[in-house]
Regions:
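Glycine-rich, proline-tolerant flexible connector loops at the mouths of alpha/beta enzymes
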Residues: 1-17
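Short beta-strand segments at enzyme active-site cores
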Residues: 1-2, 33-38, 138-140, 172
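Catalytic beta/alpha-barrel core
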Residues: 13-15, 30-40, 52-65, 76-87, ...
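Aromatic/hydrophobic pocket-lining residues that form the small-molecule binding cavity
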Residues: 16-23, 63, 90, 161
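Active-site loop-to-helix "anion-binding N-cap" substructures in soluble metabolic enzymes
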Residues: 22-25, 44, 64-72
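Conserved structured catalytic cores and adjacent interaction surfaces
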Residues: 47
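Catalytic alpha/beta core domains of metabolic enzymes, predominantly
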Residues: 71-172
Length: 172
């Protein structure tokens, strides 16, 4: 899949087939596992050709058809918690994946909306999501985003990465 940026001049990516060609080459040459976003059930079918992990983006984490399609791939599914969602609500997303018979699930904490142009990490969410029985990942860089800036481009606080990563490690 491709990531659409806020500012229309940022572009929308290479296209699915070209992107998968590049990911396949990276996978083969560097012997890496590949994780890629999917944005529609149809993209799940395409991504499974190369991806070891299909990732459901935060803004789409409640989309039943997408979650079920991701689960049906049989691959690991990483569900990024929406900035608008409580950690407890992620249980419903995992149940949709589990309904397909796929138990290969990971959850990602990536921050919670704090006002209009900021995100914060509520570290209590990590142990809460761990109670579902799946690994929880902390996406430090996304949690430090400052979306919807007046420039039309997402900003952030890269100088805080080290501190948030250490805090995430402390929480587990």
């Amino acid at each position: 899949g491709f990531q659409t940026e806020t500012l229309y001049l940022s572009g929308t990516g290479l296209g699915d087939e070209k992107a998968l060609e590049i990911l396949s080459k990276v996978k083969q040459e560097l012997k890496l596992h590949i994780c890629t976003d999917i944005h529609s059930p149809e993209e799940a079918e395409i991504a499974v050709k190369v991806a070891d992990i299909v990732q459901v983006p935060a803004f789409l984490c409640r989309q039943t058809d997408l979650l079920i399609a991701a689960g049906k791939t049989g691959k690991f599914v990483n569900i990024k918690k929406g900035q608008f969602l409580s950690p407890e609500s992620m249980k419903f997303a995992t149940e949709k994946i589990l309904s397909t018979g796929n138990k290969n699930i990971m959850l990602t904490e990536r921050g919670t909306t704090f006002g209009y142009n900021d995100l914060v990490i509520d570290f209590r969410g990590i142990p809460k999501m761990k109670t579902f029985g799946f690994p929880v990942v902390l996406d430090v860089t996304h949690s430090l985003q400052q979306p919807n800036q007046s420039s039309g481009v997402t900003g952030g606080q890269p100088e805080m990465i080290e501190y948030m990563a250490k805090a995430g490690l402390a929480v587990g």
